[in-house]
Amino acid sequence: MYVFKRIYHATHPDMMEGVDNETLRQRYLIDGLFQPGQIVLNYTHYERFVIGGAAPHGGAVRLPDQTEPESAAGHPFLERRELGVVNVADVAGTVTVDGQAYALAPKDCLYVPMGTKDVTFEGDGARFYLVSTPAHARFETRHLSIADAVPLERGGLETSNERTIYQLVVPATCKSAQLLMGLTILKTGSVWNTMPPHLHDRRSEVYFYFDLGKDDRVFHFMGEPDKARHIIMANEEAVVSPPWSIHMGSGTSNYAFIWAMGGENLDYTDMRVLDICQLK
């Protein structure tokens, strides 16, 4: 059986003009990531991201080997890839990397390097969000908690966007080939993320929204700055942001989200900040 649930092809901004909401969702929204007792993986042609979820139930689940092409079948999934893992549940879980077990508390992150042969996930109730990018070099496995992150305080309650950005997989804390990854938590009373918005033409980004209530939603804005569109997102759903697209959102309550980037450099500040008045 093919290892990926879905493949997301890259799109030119012209292709998105005039499309309906369902088409927009089909192109960029990644849902259904957590299925009990399974690992779900999706392949995107944006920086060759693989976006997935592991939801162990009644035993361990293992990151599958490659299945295609025939020349790679049976080879480890991370033969030429690196992996970021975040426990997005409210209970702890365990990730075992080539025989070494790492206990991940809620919101803990694990960086797993290229060349790792075996990765398993355990813990009833734990849900592990997975992000993988191609890699050219092997670095060290790193277990990172919020206490290990570089915290950036941004926004304010008066503008409804007071938040803490926790930089997890960044050069200051964890060496990687191209993966950048972090966690943003909005304070009570704040609903806007990534304000003001920005673009970064040299990398793609994926947002994963979580800690949302069952009846809450995030309105995620994307598209070219003068042709903004939105996708309404529920808890524990991801969305791909192409290099040409803005990416920001507003929720019906506060929430958290994981951002992950891949591209030609590891410079977190490589972006073009926009003025909100430029958006249409």
Curated annotation (Swiss-Prot):
GO terms for biological process: D-galacturonate catabolic process; D-glucuronate catabolic process; pectin catabolic process. One of its GO terms (molecular function) is 4-deoxy-L-threo-5-hexosulose-uronate ketol-isomerase activity. It comes from the Bacteria. Its cofactor is Zn(2+). Coiled coil: none annotated. Gene3D superfamilies: Jelly Rolls (2.60.120.10), pectin degrading enzyme 5-keto 4- deoxyuronate isomerase, domain 1 (2.60.120.520). Binds 1 zinc ion per subunit. Pathway: Glycan metabolism; pectin degradation; 2-dehydro-3-deoxy-D-gluconate from pectin: step 4/5. It catalyses: 5-dehydro-4-deoxy-D-glucuronate = 3-deoxy-D-glycero-2,5-hexodiulosonate. Signal peptide: none annotated. Catalyzes the isomerization of 5-dehydro-4-deoxy-D-glucuronate to 3-deoxy-D-glycero-2,5-hexodiulosonate. Belongs to the KduI family. This is 4-deoxy-L-threo-5-hexosulose-uronate ketol-isomerase.
